[in-house]
Amino acid sequence: MATSSSAWLIFSDHYPEILIAIACFLIFSLLLSARSSSEDSLPYNWPIFGMLPAIISNSQFNDFTTARLRKMGWTFIFKGPWLLDMDYIFTCDPSNINHMFNDNFENYPKGELGKVFDIFGNNIFNADGDLWHDHRKMAQTILWDGNYRTMQATFIRNKMDNALIPILDSAASKRKPVDLQDVFFRFTFDTSCFSVLAADPESLTMEFPAVPFSKAADQALDAALTRHITPRLIWKLKRFFNVGSERTLAVAWKVIDSYIYDKIAELKAKRKLVGKINSYDAVSFYMDNFNIHDDKFLRDNAFTYLLAQRNTQSLTMAWLFYALFENPKVELKILSELKSIVDESSERRFNDGFALFDSNMIQSAIYLHATLCEALRIYPPVPFEIKDAHKADVLPSGHKVRAGEKILFSPYAMARMKGIWGDDCLEFKPERWITGNGTLKHEPAYKFFAFSAGPRICLGKELSFTQMKMVVATIIYNFHLQMVKGHVVEQSNSILMDMKHGLMVQVRKRSVM
């Protein structure tokens, strides 16, 4: 035995390249096998590696997961590498989601997963228990305040008038393609900064300037995804040694903090100079209504508000237009509805020949609202979320959950299940959201999960719908957009469902008045 060991050591010392080649061959074979596994079967559960190679080797995580969930009856056990605490329960079963977010809500807190998103700090996103309840009450006061909503609507209208329409008009005149996803990212970044920090960064201009904050925020979310698929010990070691994705996160964190803290300081300096001002941005609201002036508290909540508004609205609108490119009859129905609204409205808002839709005009846009719902159903901005169990539990599907075990649930997959949304689940069909009486149809939040469900359901849901309808209506009524021929739309493998290559479009003015 000793002789055999000595021979192995001599071999490894003199021929390391052969050992490396063997290791590479084994890894390549393992990945190739994982990639070639049938969509009708679970990922192969390898010794040591578990099912992780199948995930790593697949470029479309959401579609990969959907296929397995469809085959396995909406729930299956994902086995991670040995000894690394990476086993998950994957599910898209509405009864399981209702159980976690409603019936047994207290057993599925943010808990350890809050540490994955530590860049958000100690706010409504990461908080649990009494602290979360306090955060939610304050957020509700802000988001439901009439002055706050009026300020938001006015700024959005002005931003459409002074930035969005001129940029699209210029693109039409010059016949120059524009990345619509980037336009929406910039638009919502400007509007969210104003609503949160009373500042307009003016990122949506003809020059399309670099936006360090937005880039840093995207990098931070990518790092969070890396943490999700990396053993906790590994990403904590990477953070300790400041390498890889953790180094990227640290740099991005500094950019984010610098921007938000600077804006908070500017707002405080202005208030000190002129006294209390009638500003209804979120940060001013915390200071005026709740007497909270702590910079760290204000920073944490500002960052959450900024990302919530910027990402969800921009991605929803981008995917909506992509769906319209694939379903032009839907666009014609929206246009017909908008023409009727303009004809009947006593508040026609035109500027240089362009119609602007305000929050009052779009209240009766039922078909447009249904189209947004359908876009959110098929293309949820957050395609999957993760929970972990505080105590052992049994899901309605019959699957046992260990204390501390993680559950990944997929709204993206849920939208693609015939047993949940019907045989036409893959069709983009706004009509599914309209009743026989012509009113909007309600679906339970655990089935239509775009705004979360249960006690944590999004407080800004209706406000978000109103803002998106204003923007989408204004674009569709004034312009006809077409996707650039040959442009490929592909999902990024990310926590958010953004378009990897953007959404390049040609713009043409529309004559509808």
Swiss-Prot record:
Heme binds at residue 458. It is found in: Membrane. One of its GO terms (molecular function) is heme binding. InterPro entries: Cyt_P450 (IPR001128), Cyt_P450_CS (IPR017972), Cyt_P450_E_grp-I (IPR002401), Cyt_P450_sf (IPR036396). Pathway: Alkaloid biosynthesis. The chain crosses the membrane at residues 14-34. One of its GO terms (biological process) is alkaloid metabolic process. It is a single-pass membrane protein. Its cofactor is heme. It holds the Pfam family p450. It catalyses: 4'-O-methylnorbelladine + reduced [NADPH--hemoprotein reductase] + O2 = (10bR,4aS)-noroxomaritidine + oxidized [NADPH--hemoprotein reductase] + 2 H2O + H(+); 4'-O-methylnorbelladine + reduced [NADPH--hemoprotein reductase] + O2 = (10bS,4aR)-noroxomaritidine + oxidized [NADPH--hemoprotein reductase] + 2 H2O + H(+). One of its GO terms (cellular component) is membrane. Its EC number is 1.14.19.50. The keyword Membrane applies. Keywords: Alkaloid metabolism, Heme, Iron, Membrane, Metal-binding, Monooxygenase, Oxidoreductase, Transmembrane, Transmembrane helix. Its main location: membrane. Belongs to the cytochrome P450 family. Cytochrome P450 that catalyzes an intramolecular para-para' C-C phenol coupling of 4'-O-methylnorbelladine in alkaloids biosynthesis, including haemanthamine- and crinamine-type alkaloids, promising anticancer agents. Catalyzes the formation of (10bR,4aS)-noroxomaritidine and (10bS,4aR)-noroxomaritidine from 4'-O-methylnorbelladine. This is Noroxomaritidine synthase 3. The gene is Cyp96T3.
